Amino acid sequence: TRSDGLVIGNVGGGVVANAVLGEKGVQYDLDKLPFIGSPYSATHYVFATRRELGLTNLEKLRSATGIRIGAQSVGHTNYTIGRMFAALLGLKDSKYVTGYSIPERDVALLRGEIDAIANTDDFYARNPEWIDKKLVDFHVVMEIPKGLKHPLFSNLPDIENFAKSDSARKLLSLFRLLRLTGSPFILPPATQKDRADAIKEALRKAFKDAEFVKEYRKVVGEDPTPLLPEENERAIRDLPRDPETIDLFKKFAGAGPLPSL
């Protein structure tokens, strides 16, 4: 493996998740990979119901029965966080309807084929009419990173407020930190320390450069939310990895009955 700092990798968040969750085929040691930052990290998952249901507040939502929650597929992040929202809010007899593309899911919600969705904030930035026309009621949010308020959803409670046990808090921490890592840059494990430090400093400067922000906005269509090298390393280090939390996470991501929290 090259150690001269001339090789830099950029990987999807699945590289972290697959290793932590112990998926088959992983042939790398997560703790030996130098993580040096990501151009994006912040996001907000929001739980919403269609306006026609009349579930205009949490009390009404939590007293409803048989809410149909739509998602792309079993195991998708929107599916997994939707099930976490349902469990922590104590929704009764919630159903999970999968197999949609995002446009199909949105049409299904507006037609009343499903009742609720869990979405990221960038969806509403791209589709402001959902807010302007009050097509949905918003109930709770997951802030990533924790404590980062979104201007459109700052009035919503964070889902962690409903976590009453250490196991629930660890579960949310695992989901949050897996998402926080974004699409990280990594170096070969054998990279010389002085070379790695130089690359980290270069990334810090790049992430703060006005031209980088401008170009990122032009290409991606939204502002970057950089994760600096030391923050990236901390997120990897702080990931809950105990067997109980991993098993619970897999149950929420799977097709089985909704676990209780």
Where are these predicted regions, by residue range?
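Mature extracytoplasmic/periplasmic domains
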Residues: 143-148, 204, 208, 212-237
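Hinge/capping helix and adjacent helix->loop/strand transition within the periplasmic-binding protein
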Residues: 1-7, 15, 19-111, 163-170, ...
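Extracellular/periplasmic bilobal clamshell ligand-binding domains
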Residues: 210, 228-261
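Short helices/loops that flank or line small-molecule/ion binding pockets
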Residues: 1-4, 84-88, 103-118, 122-134, ...
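Solvent-exposed coil/turn segments that connect beta secondary-structure elements
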Residues: 13-15, 51-53, 121-123, 144-146
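Paired acidic/hydrophobic, glycine-rich loop segments that form the ligand-binding mouth/hinge
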Residues: 4-12, 70, 114-121, 138-140
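C-terminal lobe and pocket-closing loops
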Residues: 126-207, 244, 255-261
